[in-house]
């Protein structure tokens, strides 16, 4: 079956009445990944994390080993078999770090035009995820590096 990610995004935009200029945040996971399950069961269940995700992003969960073909930003992606498993080309393209390696979970933030903004591999607890979501969701990544943002954010928390 063909899954058209663009149509899913458009449908969700209409359904949730969200802005079309929102960033897309994709959680690349696999069924066998323990840290992916922990991210689902702990981090994503945090009310503040959920609110930030829905405020600033169009959230998508994507099984990196999905055998379904899909289209995104006009580009077709298919399943690429490898041994007894394989990886979807969408994950290979959007979740790969330099050198072509993918770790799970991986969170990728994509512009509304389909351009990768950041690829972040590994588990994040709720506090780290909130900071990550604020940094990208509020556009701080355009004007300062993450370490500077984190220091400023932590200082502000101490004075509030």
Model regions and ranges:
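Non-globular targeting/processing and membrane-anchoring segments
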Residues: 1-3, 111, 116-160
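Detector for the c-type heme attachment site
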Residues: 37-41
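Thioredoxin-like thiol-disulfide oxidoreductase module
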Residues: 47-49, 54-118, 131-139
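Short active-site neighborhood of thiol/selenol oxidoreductases, capturing the structured segment around
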Residues: 19-34, 59
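Surface-exposed patches in mature extracellular/periplasmic domains of secreted proteins
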Residues: 23-25, 102-106, 141-146
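N-terminal post-signal-peptidase region of extra-cytosolic proteins
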Residues: 8-12, 44-45, 90-92
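Short, conserved loop/turn and helix-capping segments at secondary-structure boundaries
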Residues: 43, 47, 123-126
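A short beta-strand-turn-helix
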Residues: 1-23
């Amino acid at each position: 079956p063909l899954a058209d990610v663009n149509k899913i995004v458009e449908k969700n935009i209409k359904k949730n009445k969200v802005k079309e200029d929102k960033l897309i945040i994709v959680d690349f996971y696999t069924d066998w990944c323990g840290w992916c399950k922990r991210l689902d069961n702990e981090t994503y269940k945090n009310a503040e994390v959920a609110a930030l995700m829905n405020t600033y992003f169009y959230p998508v969960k994507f099984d990196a080993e999905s055998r379904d073909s899909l289209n995104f930003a006009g580009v077709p992606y298919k399943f690429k078999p490898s041994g007894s498993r394989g990886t979807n080309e969408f994950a290979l393209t959007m979740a790969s770090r330099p050198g072509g390696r993918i770790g799970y979970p991986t969170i990728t933030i994509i512009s509304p035009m389909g351009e990768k903004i950041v690829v972040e591999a590994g588990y994040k607890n709720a506090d780290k995820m909130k900071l990550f979501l604020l940094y990208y969701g509020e556009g701080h990544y355009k004007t300062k590096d993450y370490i500077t943002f984190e220091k400023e954010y932590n200082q502000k928390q101490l004075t509030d």
